Amino acid sequence: MASRGVVGLFLLSALPLLCLELRRGIPSLGIKDLILLSGRIFLLLALLTLVISVTTSWFNSLKPSQGHLKEGEKENEKRRRLVRERQQEAQGEKASRYIENVLKPQQEMKLKKLEERFYQMTGETWKLTAGHRLLEGDEDSEFENSSQASFETINGEAARRQNLPKFSTEISPAARPLLRKEVPDLPEEPSETAEEVVTVALRCPNGRVLRRRFFKSWNSQVLLDWMMKVGYHKSLYRLSTSFPRRALEVEGGSSLEDIGITVDTVLNVEEKEQSSQ
């Protein structure tokens, strides 16, 4: 395309010269003048041919170098792209490690502190303790095995807090029948398929959760008997509902249904305040 443009340029520049010569030679145009004009034209064509050949060869020599430059640019662009990809991967790995090692622990610690503060404000710090759930078959055996030891240790600790006389850990044989009489036996637990039955979960201060089924028509005093049987004396501890949080009013002549326990309920064992003694 460049060689054709050069040829056209030379032809356009030669046309005015030819027209000028023809005008000059028209009045006295002879054979000699025609020969000279023809020679000039051939000389001009020869010069044009030489210029075209030189220009064509020069352009052909430039093409390989331009192709080589393009290949070099492609290689450089490819290398730059690979470097950018590696840098992005390295930055992504750094960001993921920062999130895993720094941000997540900070967020978990912040959530834990907020949870502790929330439970401290609501008075439910027992939720922060690690408890375990007993199977139904193990509950009765757990009651029998731990009632005596829990009764002595927990009541002794509560007595120290409230400046009450500490119960003696050594019980004489003569006093043991009195203790058994003070902690009455619970009625037999009804089956799951029985009607008018509710399940009560007893959440202890040490985080332990015990469950038992009761008939709605039973006397509400059975809840206090159950609390004493698992080791929390009614003179030092009381029962309260979870939500809304209020003390459970257990009266001698009221049934479970009368005090509002008509569905499955969770009750908390709480230590009585000293002012209430």
UniProtKB/Swiss-Prot annotation:
Bilayer topology: Multi-pass membrane protein
Q: Where is the UBX domain?
A: 193-269
Q: Where are the transmembrane segments?
A: 2-22, 34-54
Which GO BP terms, alphabetically? ERAD pathway
- One Gene Ontology cellular component annotation held by this UniProt entry: endoplasmic reticulum membrane
Q: Where is the composition biased (Basic and acidic residues)?
A: 68-89
Q: Which UniProt keywords apply?
A: Endoplasmic reticulum, Membrane, Transmembrane, Transmembrane helix
Membrane: present as a keyword of the record? Answer: yes
What tissues express this gene product? Highly expressed in gonads. In testis, expressed in post-meiotic round spermatids, while in ovaries it is expressed in granulosa cells.
Annotated compartments: Endoplasmic reticulum membrane
Q: For side Lumenal, which residue ranges?
A: 23-33
* One Pfam assignment: UBX
All ranges on the Cytoplasmic side of the membrane: 1, 55-277
Q: Where is this region: Disordered?
A: 64-89
**The protein's assembly and partners:** Interacts with SYVN1 and VCP.
Q: Which PANTHER family match?
A: FAS-ASSOCIATED PROTEIN, UBX DOMAIN-CONTAINING PROTEIN 8
Function according to Swiss-Prot or TrEMBL: Involved in endoplasmic reticulum-associated degradation (ERAD) for misfolded lumenal proteins, possibly by tethering VCP to the endoplasmic reticulum membrane. May play a role in reproduction.
Quote the protein name from its UniProt record. Answer: UBX domain-containing protein 8
Supply the gene name: Ubxn8
